[in-house]
């Protein structure tokens, strides 16, 4: 929703959201989640066996995994904060995600108050990597601002993501970082919104969304680029 004038930017968390399977024509085949609360942001492992998603079923926005048929649901994260936007590594053994993780008393109160209203403020987020079961959790960015929309390079050794850490506002550009948090490199240099990057499985193509060249409108389009390591 559009925030009121002078208010902070927020996202809605709809408690009616569930996860479904659809065929390629858009027909619903099966409902995978039925718990009360927000179940969304689902992505499928490249191995085709598991799904990772964000849920409020425990009272906070945590990551969970389940089998591709919806069975064997397991909680992955357990710390206060908005854990979401998760993707599997190419070999299906790790997860990359972004999280808000409030620490101060005032930040914790604000987070809880907003969540009680079905809202989150996605303006302070960092990237984390962990094993699929949640073990070996590591924070790989500490840049400030909103660092989000992470995606693994097909090598499994690098992460591409969107960030506004240089300005803390606008624009958002794409950055590359090693999975251990070293070697930060800027990829796009637009005065626009560049986000949601994804590699082709062979690593030769990059697709991302951007509102560049939109004639001054609020339109966001998809772009494809060659990727050269």
Protein language model features and the residues they cover:
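Short loop/turn segments that connect beta-strands within beta-propeller blades
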Residues: 23-27, 67-71, 131-135, 178-182, ...
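Residue-level detector of Asp-centered blade-edge/turn motifs that repeat once per structural unit
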Residues: 46-47, 90-91, 154-155, 201-202
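Hydrophobic beta-strand positions that form the internal "hydrophobic ladder"
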Residues: 51-52, 95, 159, 206
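Right-handed parallel beta-helix
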Residues: 72, 93-94
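Right-handed parallel beta-helix/beta-solenoid
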Residues: 81-84, 92
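CBM-like carbohydrate-recognition segments
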Residues: 198-199, 206-212
């Amino acid at each position: 929703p559009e925030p009121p004038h002078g208010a902070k930017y927020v996202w809605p968390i709809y408690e009616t959201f569930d996860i479904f399977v659809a065929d390629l024509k858009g027909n619903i085949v099966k409902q995978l989640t039925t718990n009360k609360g927000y179940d969304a942001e689902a992505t499928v492992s490249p191995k085709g066996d598991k799904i990772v998603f964000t849920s409020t079923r425990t009272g906070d926005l945590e990551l969970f995994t389940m089998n591709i048929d919806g069975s064997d649901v397991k909680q992955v994260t357990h710390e206060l904060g908005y854990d979401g936007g998760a993707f599997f590594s190419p070999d299906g053994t790790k997860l990359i995600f972004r999280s808000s993780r409030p620490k101060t008393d005032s930040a914790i109160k604000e987070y809880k108050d907003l969540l009680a209203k079905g809202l989150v403020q996605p303006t302070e987020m960092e990237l984390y990597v962990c094993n699929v079961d949640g073990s070996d959790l590591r924070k790989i960015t500490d840049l400030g601002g909103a660092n989000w929309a992470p995606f693994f390079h097909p090598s499994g050794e690098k992460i591409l993501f969107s960030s506004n850490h240089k300005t803390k506002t606008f624009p958002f550009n794409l950055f590359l970082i090693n999975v251990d948090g070293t070697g930060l490199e800027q990829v796009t240099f637009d005065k626009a919104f560049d986000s949601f990057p994804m590699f082709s499985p062979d690593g030769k193509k990059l697709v991302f969304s951007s509102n560049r060249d939109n004639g001054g409108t609020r339109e966001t389009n998809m772009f494809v680029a060659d990727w050269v390591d």
